[in-house]
Amino acid sequence: MIEIFIEDLNQKFTFNEGITLKDILKNLNGKFKDVVGGKLNGEIIDIHTPINQSGNLKFLKKEDKESLEILRHSLAHIMAQALKEIYGDENVHLGIGPTTEHGFYYDVEIEGKSLTDEDLPQIEEKMKEIIKKGYQIERFELPREEAIKFFENKKEIYKIDIIKHNIPEGEPISLYKQGDFVDLCRGPHLPSTDKAGAFKLISVSGAYWRGKETNPMLQRIYGVAFWSEKELKDYLNMLEEAKKRDHRKIGKDLELFLIDEEIGGGLAIWLPKGAIIRKEIEDAWKKEHLKRGYQLVYTPHVGKEQLWQTSGHLSFYQENMYPRMQIEEEGYYVKPMNCPFHVEIYKSKQRSYKEFPIRLAELGTVYRYERSGALHGLMRVRGFTQDDAHIICREDQVEDEIREVLNLALNTLKSYGFDEFEVYLSTKPEKYVGDDKMWEVAENSLRKAIESTGLDYKIDDGGGAFYGPKIDVKIKDAIGRLWQCSTIQFDFNLPERFDMYYIGEDNQKHRPYMIHRAIFGSIERFIGVLLEHYAGFLPVWLSPVQVKIIPIADKHLEYAETVKQKLLENDIRVELDDRNERMNKKIRDAELQKIPFMLVVGDKEAETGTVAVREKGKQGSQTLSIDEFVSKIKEIISNKHVL
């Protein structure tokens, strides 16, 4: 027997082991007809899943965000069924069909058919037919050999591969059936196909089986799904807006960065204008960190093999590292992280308790292997710069340090115009290193730091890394998307591996606390987010060109040059458009280049020593003296105002 506490009823029940949510709902005499699934001990289940353990059960309805997982998983199966009905069961071979943040996809092989976006409406119509038929969705289990035989008969080679390599011997093999369609799956799924909500298929792309280039290329069909048509419409409108804000297009149009296949995928080159943005961000970062007591360091891009063995990267992270280099009979690796170097800086001399806290900070370039299909502009790259820092401190300093770091992170992100955050606290997993007391101190300090900000936060219970708990901060952009930025992470692993210690007041050795933290996460990615958040119209202090001077005619060039020199003397980034073009075209081109200020100069301005100021987001122009304009723009730059 098992005991289940049903949160919706605030009551505990005793059931036979193996009972399903469907059975439980029947026992409640139809009181909860709108339930689409449940959450048992934090794990999403459907109405068909056998319950074999005691715990807390929460019913999931459409208004619960977690219920979308059930909807989207079911729609992946409905799409797979539609493909088989359109192109023939024997011609369609299914790979995997998981959910995504906003929908689902399925990887398939279709003999004799290469899908394009033009095929999607036909697939959608077939899916709607399946939904309308209201097939009951049923779960059943097969013994391992029977399951393999079943899929061999259907020529489902990828399902057989999953059974043989992903499902351990002795573990139940579950399948789901709707109509004549059967798929290997753990769930969760809806009670029937007619419970499905609003959806849209959005794209087709290639995807290697298991993500390996040596495996067959499958076709991946993406869809998005929500419970209501309004939610779907709002999301599709957001996607259209996101296309206009694509940082890859903005970067090309504004000549900010370059990713050249001759150099290598995922390796960004900063062009002069993009380099200005990056330098401004890095300079502000360094200034703020020095003000807060950090010590700036620089470390090499490569390290000896032994370093990565000691750190554990070669045991746990090697698949994300680039291959070993042989130099003078010794192995070297380009660094995927800066941490071991900072540890060695700490260990370069004996440390006393009086020195703490030690805060080491670096804008360190790291290299991590990403599959070519995962690369995406500046958002997913192979070489990037982390705004990395490691704080090494005593136990009595932990709480203050965490509070200070979180304060730094939030204030920094706010200074770039972000004011909506989602904060997550990830706690101790089942398997972990370090002692329980250190975990307790760390988790309490993280929790108190978040609560001191007044922000709501979500707890990912057991979601911490094996080496320490952490805080993650996500920012919401102008069109409502969330982006992972700041991480504050305890590490109980590296201090042990590298035998880090300090001499305490008792003249004995003690193990320090070590905190990893990054504010942006990646400079490249953060700039990509900024470009999309502002649609290229960056705050004036970040704009590569802050002012464009537009002379009305050639006779005004001499005065325009005088204005330019005055601005340059005041460290204002300015360009003079001396092309033989009409003024309206020059203005339009400056707008397309997202330049925040235009100064139009003609006879009147030359005679009076003024400029006609056209400011982004404002109608018409304002006449100011050169000094007045310089004073105005310098104040905007200094205060980091957003126009």
From Swiss-Prot:
rRNA-binding in keyword set: no
GO molecular function terms noted in the UniProt entry: ATP binding; metal ion binding; threonine-tRNA ligase activity; tRNA binding
Binding positions for Zn(2+) per the UniProt entry: 339, 390, 516
Major localisation: cytoplasm
Entry keyword annotation includes Nucleotide-binding: yes
Any single GO BP term: threonyl-tRNA aminoacylation
The protein's required cofactors: Zn(2+)
TGS domain span: 1-61
InterPro entries attached to this UniProt entry: aa-tRNA-synt_IIb, aa-tRNA-synth_II, aa-tRNA-synth_II/BPL/LPL, Anticodon-bd, Anticodon-bd_dom_sf, TGS, Thr-tRNA-ligase_IIa, Thr/Ala-tRNA-synth_IIc_edit
Cofactor note: Binds 1 zinc ion per subunit.
Enzymatic reactions: tRNA(Thr) + L-threonine + ATP = L-threonyl-tRNA(Thr) + AMP + diphosphate + H(+)
Region (Catalytic): 246-539
Gene3D superfamilies membership: 3.30.54.20, Anticodon-binding domain (3.40.50.800), Bira Bifunctional Protein, Domain 2 (3.30.930.10), Threonyl-trna Synthetase, Chain A, domain 2 (3.30.980.10)
Record's keyword terms, sorted: Aminoacyl-tRNA synthetase, ATP-binding, Cytoplasm, Ligase, Metal-binding, Nucleotide-binding, Protein biosynthesis, RNA-binding, tRNA-binding, Zinc
Cellular localization per UniProt: Cytoplasm
Transmembrane region(s): none
GO cellular component terms attached to this protein's record: cytoplasm
EC number: 6.1.1.3
UniProt similarity note: Belongs to the class-II aminoacyl-tRNA synthetase family.
Quaternary data: Homodimer.
Protein function: Catalyzes the attachment of threonine to tRNA(Thr) in a two-step reaction: L-threonine is first activated by ATP to form Thr-AMP and then transferred to the acceptor end of tRNA(Thr). Also edits incorrectly charged L-seryl-tRNA(Thr).
Protein name: Threonine--tRNA ligase
